Amino acid sequence: MKKFTLEEFLDLLKKYNVEEIEGVKIEGDLEIEFEGSSIDLSAIAPLYSMLSEFGNFLYHANMALGYLQRLSAALGIPTPFAAQPQLAPAAPAAPAEVPAVEELKIPAELVRAKFEPYKEEYPGKIEEVVLGATKADGGTREYTVTLGGERSLAFYTFDAPQPHLPAIAIDVFDRRPMLAKAVRMHYEDVLDNPAEWARKCVKKFGADLVTLHLISTDPLLDDTPASEAVKVLEDVLQAVKCPIIVGGSGNKEKDPEVLEKAAEVAEGERIMLASATLDMDWERIANAAKKYGHVVLSWTQMDINNQKTLNRYLLKRVEMPRDSIVMDPTTAALGYGLDYAFTNMERIRISGLKGDTDLNFPISSGTTNAWGAREAWMVDSPIEEDTPWGPRELRGPIWEIITGLTLSLAGVDLFMMMHPVAVAVLKEVFNTLGGKVSGGVADPGEWIFMEV
């Protein structure tokens, strides 16, 4: 390898009259010698600038030498520089080998896995309340009706079994009441005989219980003395052997006396006294139920806080047994009323299941209130521009059915009803939802042609 100084290199370019070089590449080592033993660092900055200019010069000189080599070779003039070897273009890289993929084989049988559906478990349980007493229990009823016992929401049998399906009681009155025509037509022959009325409800219409309303005791009606009114209760107890519910007239002053007398007359039969409310002498009614071994109905007006308060009074002040309390949060049957009733009952049931011991009692519904809505019993709409309502003979019972079905989904355990068709339909629905009816529609696509 030949060494030459920068001055020698410039003289060489002048020798061949090279004023500008382009496309020339110069390769080699650059040596810089410093004279003396010490280096002035302040000289490094201009040295760096000079080297930068020299590097730029070398770039252009390299291009010029390449031009000279090509020109000398064409003219046959020898040059002191060896020609730079031309590098052969790199061979293309061989394609990477792709690993072989095994053929996807579809299994003849899918992997079996057991599906475990999620189950909602609640810490609480609804109290079980038995209505009626058989001979073994000191009464004369042929059977008893048990309410409550749920550990899940209504008909959520996939979460927990529903030990007792909702029961249905049919209303009976101790005097001829004002009834919608669609209801009255089924009881016309027994309206003046409460005992026969009760027998018809059980034998013909399949009532689980009978609710006897002693409305004749109302001071604004017959003002029947309590001692006289309870004779009707005795007749009904003889006529039917199902559990009995006894109600008054709704008079705040008279009802405690009437229900107290009824509790005494029906001692041992475990009837339900309907009802104790915050605006009447609830303590007297509850004490009568406790003394004679009966159940008390705790009634409030769509207020969960009042329901908790009344239940707490019955438990703490009267020391009522927990298996002797049933709640009635009130049933409304139209528009917002039904919405409020459902929401209130649902809140009560969920609170009970979550462990609220002031609310974990069975729920009763006065479903007969459905007939209080004019849409259930009027011949047609009073508004001229309104569309026809349809025959009230069908509309009325459907109204009662919808009311009962809606509230059953909120958790109601006991329904007090009137129309026999509504009773039959709800019984069928409860048995179906509760898994008591086996089988189903052979061809679900033909459901529209089924006869009911």
From Swiss-Prot:
Pfam families: CdhD (PF03599). It comes from the Archaea. Transmembrane segments: none annotated. One of its GO terms (biological process) is one-carbon metabolic process. Belongs to the CdhD family. Part of a complex that catalyzes the reversible cleavage of acetyl-CoA, allowing autotrophic growth from CO(2). Probably maintains the overall quaternary structure of the ACDS complex. Heterodimer of delta and gamma chains. The ACDS complex is made up of alpha, epsilon, beta, gamma and delta chains with a probable stoichiometry of (alpha(2)epsilon(2))(4)-beta(8)-(gamma(1)delta(1))(8). This is Acetyl-CoA decarbonylase/synthase complex subunit delta. The gene is cdhD.
